Amino acid sequence: MDHIYDVIILGAGPAGLSAGLYAGRSRLDTLIIEKGQAGGQIINTDEIENYPGQIVEGETGVSLVRRMYEQTEQFGAEHVRDTITDVELNGEIKVLTGEKDTYQAKNIIIATGAYARPIGCKGEGQFRGKGVSYCATCDA
């Protein structure tokens, strides 16, 4: 807990990885904390055609996230997998307590993303991906 980062980014989806890339490029001592697998919702995407940046033909969510993750590492960002259970944002040094460790930083970026929220109607789970979707443009 003695290490004080310039910035800690909560979340390793596209927004968190982008923030980590730019923080690293700016030579900030950067830590990205993700509670699960890096990538967020985009890892469930089979084909990406309309994402800003250098997309290769047949790009999947997994391949894009892998490249983004590697870029953050190339610019010096560290990654840990932990679930943050408490935050103390008062004062110059912010303290984040996780299930595995405690982290300190001068700045925090919250990029925890979103998730599909089922409404709980009859047949919703049964027909997910078969007419029930959480992506309007996917069904267009």
Feature names for model-found ranges:
Residues 4-31:
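N-terminal Rossmann-like FAD-binding beta1-loop-alpha1 element of flavoenzymes
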Residues 20-21, 44, 120-123:
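Short amphipathic alpha-helical segments
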Residues 29-35, 42:
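Short beta-strand "acidic-cap" motif of Rossmann-like dinucleotide-binding folds
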Residues 37-38, 56, 137-138:
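Short, acidic/turn-prone active-site loops that include or flank metal/cofactor-
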